[in-house]
């Protein structure tokens, strides 16, 4: 579970991620949002976000509720909006690279609907998000000479597979990789 934040703009942050992240991060985003919406944080309901088969994400045990990124997402409505926008960015990028709709599309649509219904705000409030949490190796986490965005870029760059994982659209590979 993580949010690989490489840019303050949630869509731009999604656009530069490797193929592997574009495939798996929408699911992690939906799982995180389900926990944030559940009794563990906002208490909007435990069965609001449907998986592709229509069943809700299981939030009863609150898996990952203590993860730094989940805590960050729940710290403010703006942070939650940022995560939803990032999720949509990931879904758009998935469709661009793979030519099909990700199985998390329905859950993300519902996440936006519930967010707007419960808060009375649109996702544009994501611009008010607080500084991002970093969940990664200590070598990046405790490097006080870099910010969180740079830490995530270096974390991604440290993966031996990352630089060659833009097979679907090599033009998306960022210059920092």
Q: Regions from the language model: what does each represent?
A:
Residues 1-66, 70-177:
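Sequence termini and other peripheral, non-core segments
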């Amino acid at each position: 579970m993580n949010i690989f934040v490489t840019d303050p703009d949630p869509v731009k942050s999604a656009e530069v991620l490797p193929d592997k992240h574009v495939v798996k991060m929408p699911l992690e985003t939906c799982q995180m949002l389900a926990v944030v919406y559940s009794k563990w944080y906002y208490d909007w309901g435990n069965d609001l976000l449907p998986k592709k088969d229509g069943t809700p994400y299981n939030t009863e045990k609150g898996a990952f509720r203590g993860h730094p990124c989940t805590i960050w997402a729940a710290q403010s409505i703006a942070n939650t909006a940022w995560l939803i926008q990032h999720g949509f960015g990931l879904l758009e990028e998935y469709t661009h690279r793979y030519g099909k709709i990700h199985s998390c599309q329905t859950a993300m649509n519902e996440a936006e609907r519930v967010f707007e219904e419960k808060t009375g705000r649109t996702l544009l409030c994501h611009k008010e998000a607080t500084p991002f949490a970093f969940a990664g190796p200590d070598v990046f986490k405790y490097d006080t000479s870099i910010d969180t965005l740079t830490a995530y870029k270096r974390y991604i760059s440290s993966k031996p597979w990352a630089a060659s994982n833009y097979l679907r659209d090599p033009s998306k590979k960022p210059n920092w990789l």
